[in-house]
Every structure is written in C-alpha cells, then in structure tokens.
C-alpha cells in the first residue's frame, strides 16, 4: 500500500499542461514523496488528445475517467466534488493518504505535512477569502443554517478559523482544492453524494440568485460533510 497518492482534476483540455507543472514540481521538490503516484480523474466526455495524453505520460500517473451528466457539468464546480469521489474510489485499498490538489497548485518544498498522523483523519487549508463564509462573530445565516441542517452538523463541531489572507475569522470553511484524507473513510464519496442532492434541493434555490452561492456550493457542502464526519478533537 502506498503511503500517499496525489490526485488532481483534469476538468478541461487546459488542465493537462497545468497538471504537468504540478507533477514536475512534485518530482523536483517532493522530497521522499517525489515518486508518489498521481491519479488524474477526468470527465469521460473530455476529449483527451494525443498531445495532452503525452503531457502526462508517466508510470506514476494514472488517468481515471468518470461519468458526470451534462446537467451536473452546467452547475459551477460540481466536477470538483464528483472528480474527488472518483479519485477516492480509484485509490481505495491502495493508499493510506489521498492528497487532493487542484491544477493551480505547485509544490515548492517537501509535502510531507500531507502524511496524516495516526490520530488524524483529515487535513485542510482554509479558504483564501471569506466570500460566502460564515463570520464567527455573527449567527449563521439562512444558507449556512441549511447546510448544517442537511449535513447533520453538531454545534460543538464548529470552531473559529482565519481565512488564508486573514480578512476575517469564520466558521470552518475548507479550500476544496487543497486537502488530505484517508480514502477508507469515504469522505469524498459522501461529499459527492450530498452535493448531488443539495444543489438541486429547493431549500438552496433562493440563494442561487447570488452567483457566489452557485460557485461555492460545492465547497460549502464539503464543510458540512467534514464537520459531520469528524470531531475537531
């Protein structure tokens, strides 16, 4: 079993060159993890050209096609949650840790912090900016109240965290493009399942009049699923 498998989503033809840069950075700066496998989930409808396939040709890279409906593709960033679940399924039983990094990531020093300690089930990076995040100093608004209710989040699982740029202290809201989990926990599968249900749910339709709620719905559901799955302790 691998200690770590990395995963990065190829959502469009332009993804391949960026993922190649991520792969090269892992080789150059990955330290003891420089030979860790990389899985690349992609929609099965994506036309993977010979040129793009050649960019990622490596014994350490494995392409993972997955199904996603045209309706789902039309909803912003739904492909992230669905692709993460495909990666998790592909590495189940093959890795102790799955590190999910979107294509805009580069590794500049050993990513050994992604190797989770025995007592840790999930590691994350906070969101960069507050955007639709829930300010810690204020009660949760209607959107986050609905997220917590549908995801069955216990109130004592909430805690304060700063955004990356430290513009606010918010309730837990994780960057969907930089996270690590244990595949056997099925976290990404639950994320995908709940996202597919909730983005269609009438409770959330009114919020989508503001396009930011559409863009970050996948990330809000991720927060709800993580908080319902694990205790901060």
Report each predicted region and the residues it spans:
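N-terminal anchoring/stem segment of glycosyltransferases
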Residues: 1-75, 89-94
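A structural signal for well-ordered alpha-helical segments within the folded catalytic domains
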Residues: 17-20, 24, 78-82, 216-220, ...
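Charged, glycine/proline-rich intrinsically disordered loops and linkers
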Residues: 135-162
């Amino acid at each position: 079993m691998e200690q770590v498998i990395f995963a990065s989503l190829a959502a469009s033809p332009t993804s391949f060159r960026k993922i190649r840069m991520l792969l090269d950075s892992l080789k150059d700066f990955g330290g003891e993890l420089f030979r860790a496998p990389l899985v690349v989930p992609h929609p099965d409808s994506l036309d993977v050209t010979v040129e793009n396939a050649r960019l990622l040709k490596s014994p350490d890279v494995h392409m993972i096609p997955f199904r996603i409906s045209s309706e789902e593709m039309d909803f912003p960033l739904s492909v992230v949650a669905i692709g993460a679940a495909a990666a998790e399924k592909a590495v189940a039983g093959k890795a102790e840790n799955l590190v999910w990094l979107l294509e805009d990531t580069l590794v500049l020093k050993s990513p050994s912090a992604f190797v989770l300690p025995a007592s840790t089930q999930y590691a994350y990076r906070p969101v960069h900016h507050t955007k639709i995040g829930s300010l810690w100093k204020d009660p949760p608004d209607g959107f986050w109240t609905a997220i917590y209710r549908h995801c069955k989040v216990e109130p004592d699982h909430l805690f304060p965290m700063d955004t990356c740029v430290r513009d606010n202290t918010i309730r837990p809201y994780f960057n969907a493009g930089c996270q690590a989990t244990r595949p056997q926990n099925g976290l990404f599968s639950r994320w995908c399942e709940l996202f597919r249900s909730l983005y269609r749910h009438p409770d959330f339709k009114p919020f989508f009049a503001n396009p930011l709620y559409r863009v970050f719905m996948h990330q809000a559901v991720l927060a709800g699923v993580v908080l319902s799955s694990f205790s901060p302790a």
